[in-house]
């Protein structure tokens, strides 16, 4: 199940866009909410409905084998830190083997020691709870330090240190109760992980199905019947048996086959080749019209060494000449409506040992790059992967679907390619899989595509080559005047520049700017407007090649706003005000009020560079056409005006 985790939003106190760090063995339910610098260690269980937000106080630490139950809220203040067991500062530290139960509130600065139990609806704020404490239900702990091994009865309000020091010690029965709750949640953790593992859940489903529908046995003599196994498969069975491997079978109907949900068949324990072949022939006959595959298992290493489909609906057993070792390729024709380029891309990924995954998003989520993971494709066989891929495209018709190539050893993505849009499938050219942090794929920007200029495409590629993160932001005309930008899509590889074209098409009436972020320095290195409501994209000639992390927009490039109504003197004054650190504002007045000097405050211009300031001024001049408009320069330190410049006079 996909984990819903987000980077911390940019705020006045934090602009590092930190994201959660989740250990591979931890289980985080998709209905939980993780934001910011949250560090989750091994075997942590986070239940649905929890909210862990490190967007103000940061970072958070959640120790190994800790369970966070439904409805828990963990948050922190901008100021205030605690010292964790590793000697570092944290907004919230939760130790190992801690149980935080339903509806509890942990608000930093807060420290919860190892082995603690926090009861239902209890609150810990600006406090330290020592190791081994048992806090019961509806308790408030604030501004105190609870010594280790203390028991806090239900309903108590602990707000003074004298109250904390007088608390009784934990008794044996309290420890047993806390251990009982922890044990239950560890069992839940194992159960949730098993439910997402086909190999674990399949035998349980098969057992339930056998209990509900007892099979009717039909024993028939095989003598005189034509054996459905081919000579090639007889060779494979013989080789597997000679090497000491076990042979088993799996089967699936057409619906389960599309989701790679195979059902386990019998394990053939006999060592006689004739007995094994007879058993396989019997199973093929029983499951006629279904998919059946042959499995070779190494009993010592407890892993599969061979997988091959030997029967398909409407076909006889499939011959194969592959050897008895894990196989990543099967020559097959394209499945259904899949584009030949998609099939070639999948084949290339499988040949290199990568795992295939898919993600989908509707038009609204696509604009914010909020992709949802589809059912995992565990198979390494090309026909099975293509069938599952086609089923995913059919299931999510009318949505965006992208193909993911995953390097399981390095635990990183090597390919992200959109293969379907709401209008239909996408024609793609096969690309060599590379880590998504790099970009050497060529992207066309000329010809019939007028949304992106060649300079802009080159600039994006330069930023990616330098290791920068590339994101987009957009704003309508009203928000643009106040510089209130909203987050758009994130571009992690040159292959996603097509996504940028779609994003520009969807926001034709908005301002869109491109942002380059240095992830190491955690600062923005580029902000440039690439699209305006008139539909024109900026022709960005400011390439970052050879400049390290120092690209900066200039007033003469990057799509600078039209300044035909502003004199060069005014532009120079605006530049000087910005360079001196002054803030800009506007005031407007009609002709009648102008005579009495009764100016009305306009929007405040929170621009970070000359481009944005001039664009915002132009937008205001258009909005207040026919009125007097003047620019105000304000010294934020002294809170006084340093300049008043008349920009526009009322029409007479």
Curated annotation (Swiss-Prot):
It is an enzyme of class 4 (lyase). Residues 537-566 have a biased composition (Polar residues). Its cofactor is Zn(2+). Residues 338-422 are annotated as: RbcS-like repeat 2, CcmMS2. It catalyses: hydrogencarbonate + H(+) = CO2 + H2O. Residues 1-193 are annotated as: Does not have CA activity. The keyword Zinc applies. GO terms for molecular function: carbonate dehydratase activity; structural constituent of carboxysome shell; zinc ion binding. The active site is at residue 56. Residues 530-566 are annotated as: Disordered. One of its GO terms (biological process) is photosynthesis. Residues 565-649 are annotated as: RbcS-like repeat 4, CcmMS4. It is found in: Carboxysome. Binds 3 zinc per trimer. The keyword Zinc applies. It comes from the Bacteria. Changing residue 200 to S: Loss of CA activity (in the CcmM 1-209 construct). Its EC number is 4.2.1.1. Zn(2+) binds at residues 75, 102, 107. Keywords: Bacterial microcompartment, Carbon dioxide fixation, Carboxysome, Disulfide bond, Lyase, Metal-binding, Photosynthesis, Repeat, Zinc. Functions as a scaffold protein for the assembly of beta-carboxysomes, initiates carboxysome assembly by coalescing RuBisCO (ribulose bisphosphate carboxylase, rbcL-rbcS). Produced as a full-length and a shorter form; both forms are required for correct carboxysome assembly and growth. The N-terminal structure crystallizes as a homotrimer; zinc is bound between adjacent monomers. The C-terminal RbcS-like domains bind to holo-RuBisCO. Full length protein interacts with CcmN. Belongs to the gamma-class carbonic anhydrase family. The N-terminus (residues 1-164) forms a trimer with a partially blocked channel forms at the trimer interface. The C-terminus has 4 domains that resemble the small subunit of RuBisCO (rbcS) joined by flexible linkers; the first one (CcmMS1) has been crystallized and folds much like RbcS. CcmMS1 binds to holo-RuBisCO (RbcL(8)-RbcS(8)), a CcmMS1-CcmMS2 constructs binds about 10-fold better, while the entire C-terminus with all 4 CcmMS domains binds with an intermediate affinity. CcmMS1 binds to a different region of RbcL than does RbcS, up to 5 CcmMS1 domains can bind to the intact holo enzyme. This is Carboxysome assembly protein CcmM. The lineage of its organism: Bacteria, Bacillati, Cyanobacteriota, Cyanophyceae, Acaryochloridales. The gene is ccmM.
């Amino acid at each position: 199940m996909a984990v819903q985790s987000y980077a911390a939003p940019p705020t006045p106190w934090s602009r590092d866009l930190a994201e959660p760090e989740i250990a591979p063995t931890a289980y985080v339910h998709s209905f939980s909410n993780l934001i910011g610098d949250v560090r989750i260690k091994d075997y942590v269980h986070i239940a649905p409905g929890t909210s862990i937000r490190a967007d103000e106080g940061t970072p958070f630490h959640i120790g190994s084998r800790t369970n966070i139950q439904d409805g828990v809220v963990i948050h922190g203040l901008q100021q205030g830190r605690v010292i964790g067991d590793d000697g570092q500062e944290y907004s919230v530290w939760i130790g190992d083997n801690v149980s935080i139960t339903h509806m509890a509130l942990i608000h930093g600065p807060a420290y919860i020691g190892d082995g603690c139990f926090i009861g239902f609806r209890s609150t810990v704020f600006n406090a330290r709870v020592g190791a081994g404490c048992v806090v019961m239900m509806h308790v408030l702990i604030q501004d105190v330090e609870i010594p280790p091994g203390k028991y806090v009865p239900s309903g108590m309000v602990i707000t003074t240190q004298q109250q904390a020091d007088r608390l009784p010690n934990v008794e044996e029965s309290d420890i047993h109760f806390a251990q009982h709750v922890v044990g239950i949640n560890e069992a839940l953790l194992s159960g949730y992980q098993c439910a997402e593992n086909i190999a674990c859940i399949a035998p349980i489903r098969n057992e339930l199905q056998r209990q509900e529908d007892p099979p009717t046995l039909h024993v028939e003599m095989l003598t005189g019947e034509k054996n459905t196994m081919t000579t090639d498969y007889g060779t494979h069975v013989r080789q597997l048996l000679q090497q000491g491997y076990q042979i088993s079978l799996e089967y699936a109907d057409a619906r389960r086959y599309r989701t790679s949900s195979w059902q386990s068949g019998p394990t053939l324990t006999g060592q006689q080749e004739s007995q094994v072949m007879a058993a396989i022939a019997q199973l093929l006959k029983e499951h006629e019209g279904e998919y059946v595959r042959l499995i070779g298992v190494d009993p010592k290493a407890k892993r599969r060494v061979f997988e091959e489909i030997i029967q398909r609906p409407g076909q006889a057993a499939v011959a194969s000449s592959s050897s008895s070792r894990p196989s990543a390729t099967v020559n097959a024709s394209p499945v259904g409506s899949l584009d030949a380029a998609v099939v070639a891309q999948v084949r290339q990924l499988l040949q290199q040992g990568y795992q295939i995954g898919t993600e989908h998003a509707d038009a609204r989520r696509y604009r914010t790059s909020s992709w949802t993971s589809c059912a995992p494709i565990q198979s390494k066989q090309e026909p099975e992967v293509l069938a599952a891929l086609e089923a995913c495209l059919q299931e999510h018709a009318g949505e965006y679907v992208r193909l993911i190539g995953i390097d399981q050893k390095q635990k990183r993505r090597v390919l992200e390619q959109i293969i379907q849009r709401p209008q239909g499938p996408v024609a793609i050219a096969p690309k060599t899989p590379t880590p998504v942090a790099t970009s050497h794929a060529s992207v066309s920007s000329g010809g019939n595509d007028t949304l992106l200029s060649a300079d802009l495409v080159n600039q994006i590629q330069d930023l990616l080559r330098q290791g920068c993160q590339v994101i987009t932001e957009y704003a309508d005309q009203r928000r643009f005047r106040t510089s209130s930008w909203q987050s758009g899509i994130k571009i992690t590889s040159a292959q996603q520049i097509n996504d940028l074209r779609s994003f520009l098409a969807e926001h034709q009436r908005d301002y869109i700017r491109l942002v380059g972020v240095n992830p190491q320095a955690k600062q923005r290195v580029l902000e440039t407007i690439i699209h305006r409501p008139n539909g024109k994209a900026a022709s960005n000639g400011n390439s970052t090649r050879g400049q390290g992390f120092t690209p900066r927009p200039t007033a003469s490039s990057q799509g600078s706003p039209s300044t035909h109504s502003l004199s060069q003197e005014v532009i120079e004054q605006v530049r000087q005000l910005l360079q001196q650190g002054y803030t800009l504002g506007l005031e407007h007045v009609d002709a009648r009020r102008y005579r009495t000097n009764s100016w009305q405050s306009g929007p405040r211009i929170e621009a970070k560079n000359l481009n944005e300031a001039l664009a915002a001024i132009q937008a205001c001049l258009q909005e207040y056409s026919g009125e007097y408009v003047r620019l105000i320069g304000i010294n934020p330190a002294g809170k006084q005006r340093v300049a008043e410049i008349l920009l526009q006079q009322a029409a007479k």
